Protein backbone atom coordinates (compact mmCIF):
# COMPACT_ATOMS: atom_id res chain seq x y z
CA UNK A 1 0.00 0.00 0.00
CA UNK A 2 2.80 2.43 0.86
CA UNK A 3 4.33 1.83 -2.57
CA UNK A 4 1.17 3.29 -4.14
CA UNK A 5 1.21 6.38 -1.92
CA UNK A 6 2.10 9.38 -4.07
CA UNK A 7 3.61 12.06 -1.85
CA UNK A 8 3.80 14.51 -4.75
CA UNK A 9 0.07 14.19 -5.39
CA UNK A 10 -0.62 14.78 -1.69
CA UNK A 11 1.54 17.92 -1.79
CA UNK A 12 -0.41 19.17 -4.82
CA UNK A 13 -3.69 18.47 -3.02
CA UNK A 14 -2.47 20.36 0.06
CA UNK A 15 -1.49 23.28 -2.17
CA UNK A 16 -4.91 23.16 -3.82
CA UNK A 17 -6.57 23.30 -0.40
CA UNK A 18 -4.27 26.15 0.73
CA UNK A 19 -5.14 28.03 -2.44
CA UNK A 20 -8.85 27.54 -1.84
CA UNK A 21 -8.67 28.51 1.84
CA UNK A 22 -6.62 31.62 1.12
CA UNK A 23 -8.77 32.44 -1.93
CA UNK A 24 -5.64 32.57 -4.08
CA UNK A 25 -6.72 31.83 -7.64
CA UNK A 26 -3.16 31.43 -8.97
CA UNK A 27 -2.24 28.65 -6.54
CA UNK A 28 -5.65 26.99 -6.81
CA UNK A 29 -5.67 26.92 -10.61
CA UNK A 30 -2.02 25.90 -10.92
CA UNK A 31 -2.36 23.05 -8.41
CA UNK A 32 -5.64 21.93 -9.97
CA UNK A 33 -4.21 21.85 -13.49
CA UNK A 34 -1.13 19.96 -12.32
CA UNK A 35 -3.29 17.42 -10.47
CA UNK A 36 -5.33 16.81 -13.62
CA UNK A 37 -2.17 16.44 -15.69
CA UNK A 38 -0.63 14.12 -13.09
CA UNK A 39 -3.56 11.69 -12.87
CA UNK A 40 -4.29 11.52 -16.60
CA UNK A 41 -2.29 10.45 -19.64
CA UNK A 42 -1.38 14.13 -20.01
CA UNK A 43 1.42 13.39 -17.54
CA UNK A 44 3.58 12.55 -20.55
CA UNK A 45 3.88 16.33 -21.06
CA UNK A 46 5.63 16.95 -17.73
CA UNK A 47 9.12 16.92 -19.30
CA UNK A 48 8.00 19.60 -21.77
CA UNK A 49 6.35 21.66 -19.03
CA UNK A 50 9.46 21.37 -16.86
CA UNK A 51 11.72 22.36 -19.75
CA UNK A 52 9.66 25.28 -21.05
CA UNK A 53 7.12 26.26 -18.38
CA UNK A 54 9.29 28.86 -16.67
CA UNK A 55 10.15 30.61 -19.93
CA UNK A 56 6.52 30.52 -21.04
CA UNK A 57 5.45 31.98 -17.69
CA UNK A 58 8.02 34.76 -17.98
CA UNK A 59 6.81 35.46 -21.53
CA UNK A 60 3.18 35.73 -20.38
CA UNK A 61 4.20 37.94 -17.44
CA UNK A 62 6.21 40.18 -19.77
CA UNK A 63 3.26 40.49 -22.15
CA UNK A 64 1.09 41.50 -19.19
CA UNK A 65 3.59 44.12 -18.07
CA UNK A 66 4.03 45.57 -21.58
CA UNK A 67 0.32 45.63 -22.45
CA UNK A 68 -0.29 49.15 -21.03
CA UNK A 69 2.39 50.46 -23.40
CA UNK A 70 0.97 48.60 -26.40
CA UNK A 71 -2.61 49.61 -25.62
CA UNK A 72 -1.72 53.26 -25.12
CA UNK A 73 -2.92 53.29 -21.51
CA UNK A 74 0.64 54.31 -20.59
CA UNK A 75 1.40 57.23 -22.87
CA UNK A 76 4.72 57.90 -24.51
CA UNK A 77 4.81 61.18 -22.62
CA UNK A 78 4.54 59.45 -19.25
CA UNK A 79 7.23 56.98 -20.28
CA UNK A 80 9.56 59.86 -21.14
CA UNK A 81 8.71 61.63 -17.87
CA UNK A 82 9.80 58.53 -15.97
CA UNK A 83 13.38 59.49 -16.79
CA UNK A 84 13.15 62.83 -14.97
CA UNK A 85 11.15 61.94 -11.86
CA UNK A 86 13.18 60.84 -8.83
CA UNK A 87 10.57 58.25 -7.88
CA UNK A 88 10.56 56.81 -11.39
CA UNK A 89 14.38 56.73 -11.53
CA UNK A 90 14.41 54.78 -8.26
CA UNK A 91 11.76 52.46 -9.74
CA UNK A 92 13.96 51.92 -12.81
CA UNK A 93 16.96 51.12 -10.58
CA UNK A 94 14.91 48.67 -8.52
CA UNK A 95 13.58 47.09 -11.71
CA UNK A 96 17.15 46.61 -12.92
CA UNK A 97 18.15 45.07 -9.58
CA UNK A 98 15.19 42.69 -9.52
CA UNK A 99 15.78 41.62 -13.13
CA UNK A 100 19.43 40.95 -12.30
CA UNK A 101 18.43 38.96 -9.20
CA UNK A 102 15.94 36.96 -11.26
CA UNK A 103 18.68 36.12 -13.76
CA UNK A 104 20.94 34.93 -10.96
CA UNK A 105 18.00 32.95 -9.60
CA UNK A 106 17.43 31.11 -12.87
CA UNK A 107 21.13 30.17 -13.00
CA UNK A 108 21.12 29.00 -9.37
CA UNK A 109 17.96 26.93 -9.78
CA UNK A 110 19.48 25.27 -12.85
CA UNK A 111 22.86 24.57 -11.28
CA UNK A 112 21.68 23.62 -7.77
CA UNK A 113 18.36 21.83 -7.98
CA UNK A 114 18.61 20.86 -4.30
CA UNK A 115 17.53 24.39 -3.32
CA UNK A 116 14.45 24.37 -5.55
CA UNK A 117 12.20 22.55 -3.06
CA UNK A 118 12.88 25.08 -0.31
CA UNK A 119 12.38 28.01 -2.65
CA UNK A 120 9.12 26.57 -3.92
CA UNK A 121 7.80 25.86 -0.43
CA UNK A 122 8.64 29.39 0.68
CA UNK A 123 7.11 30.94 -2.42
CA UNK A 124 3.93 28.90 -2.31
CA UNK A 125 3.54 29.64 1.39
CA UNK A 126 4.03 33.33 0.65
CA UNK A 127 1.48 33.22 -2.15
CA UNK A 128 -1.08 31.21 -0.22
CA UNK A 129 -0.68 32.76 3.22
CA UNK A 130 0.65 36.27 2.63
CA UNK A 131 -1.24 37.14 -0.56
CA UNK A 132 2.01 37.28 -2.52
CA UNK A 133 2.46 36.54 -6.20
CA UNK A 134 4.36 33.55 -7.57
CA UNK A 135 7.32 35.43 -9.02
CA UNK A 136 9.14 34.72 -5.79
CA UNK A 137 11.24 31.66 -6.71
CA UNK A 138 13.42 33.55 -9.16
CA UNK A 139 13.98 36.53 -6.90
CA UNK A 140 14.40 34.30 -3.84
CA UNK A 141 16.96 32.20 -5.72
CA UNK A 142 18.75 35.38 -6.81
CA UNK A 143 18.92 36.58 -3.21
CA UNK A 144 20.07 33.13 -2.11
CA UNK A 145 22.83 33.23 -4.73
CA UNK A 146 24.14 36.42 -3.10
CA UNK A 147 24.26 34.70 0.30
CA UNK A 148 25.88 31.47 -0.86
CA UNK A 149 28.16 33.07 -3.43
CA UNK A 150 26.99 31.25 -6.56
UniProtKB/Swiss-Prot annotation:
InterPro entries: UPF0756_TM (IPR007382). GO terms for cellular component: plasma membrane. The chain crosses the membrane at residues 22-42, 45-65, 83-103, 115-135. Its main location: membrane. It is found in: Cell membrane. Pfam families: DUF441. Keywords: Cell membrane, Membrane, Transmembrane, Transmembrane helix. It comes from the Bacteria. The keyword Magnesium does not apply. It is a multi-pass membrane protein. Belongs to the UPF0756 family. PANTHER family: UPF0756 MEMBRANE PROTEIN YEAL. HAMAP family: UPF0756. This is UPF0756 membrane protein A1S_2121. It comes from Acinetobacter baumannii (strain ATCC 17978 / DSM 105126 / CIP 53.77 / LMG 1025 / NCDC KC755 / 5377).
